[in-house]
Amino acid sequence: MNFPCIYHVYSIRKIMFLVIVACLPGIFAKYYFFGIGTLIQIFFSIFISLVLEIIILKIRSKNIKNYLQDTSLVLTSVLFGVSIPPLLPWWMTSIGLFFAIVVAKHLYGGIGQNIFNPAMVGYAVLLISFPVYMNNWNERDFSLSFFNDFKKSAYIIFFKNDITTVSSSYLNIIPDAFTTATPLNNFKIKSHLKDDFFLKENIIKNKEVSIQTSWKCINISFFLGGIFLLFTKIICWRIPISFLSSLGMLSIITYFYSKELFMSPQVHFFSGGTMICAFFIATDPVTAACNNVGKIVFGIIIGFLVWIIRNYSDYPDAIAFSVLFANMTVPLVDYYTKSSGYGRNNI
């Protein structure tokens, strides 16, 4: 007999471990294109999260060992660390993690009781507070050895990344904006400055090809990790498929309506955090809808919001805001999509 409430037989600890393993292709791709700063951010995020978690557990008089055994904290840190720019200053990373661990998680009661995705709360706070830094994606310098790349990245992250330096680099829209932006940033820049005679068409095209290739490989890597999660039945197919389907349908319709005003489906699928959202963030079992129909509705809501925010807001990517808005709808979605009791016929 198959019980509807049981989907897999893994322990929580093993589930978290397998999700982290599934992240490895995407993490490696980000390291390859953006340098070792990505790895530094991930390990630093784990360290800061552990410190914050231990402090809060002590304040709440909880058993630290029991709470840390499920390794969910490590997964949150990995997802946060891989989502932020590789050269983000350490103190900004710490601020984001404070909101992720202390505010989004423990103020709601701890693991399993939070209504918002902790990693996305931390990311959204940083994106609103420090938009220049959060769009500063510096391409990797392939001329540097591993050790020199580590030394340079660590120096920038922990000692030299001040607001004056980063802001001044962004005052020169061309070519700096294109060397550090994502394809979603480029679409926004071109839509605002398409009549500016300073925009050299050959510069735009050359930079976009390089940037699009990087983010396409990154998203494909996270997609492969997501397929692994589906194959091992760690996640259900309903949220990723409904999210990607709704985003794809809207982008196809609007792109054919106006290629000047709307992003192409390729840009939507293979830029920013689309694939990590579909398979690793939106599928968070604590903050997503519970039943099967609700999961489909939840995924559709995220896809719709991503399309709206990317096309009509000033924020180039929309993953964090879309997931958090969708998290708010979960009680309503669950209420109106709940099935009748097990063993009863639907009316």
Curated annotation (Swiss-Prot):
**Transmembrane feature ranges:** 15-35, 36-56, 84-104, 114-134, 217-237, 239-259, 261-281, 289-309, 315-335
Q: Say where the protein is mainly found.
A: membrane
Keyword Transmembrane listed: yes
Cite the EC number. Answer: 7.-.-.-
Which protein family is it in? Belongs to the NqrB/RnfD family.
What the entry lists under NCBIfam families is as follows:
rnfD
Function field: Part of a membrane-bound complex that couples electron transfer with translocation of ions across the membrane.
The name on file for this protein is: Ion-translocating oxidoreductase complex subunit D
Q: Which organism is it from?
A: Buchnera aphidicola subsp. Acyrthosiphon pisum (strain APS) (Acyrthosiphon pisum symbiotic bacterium)
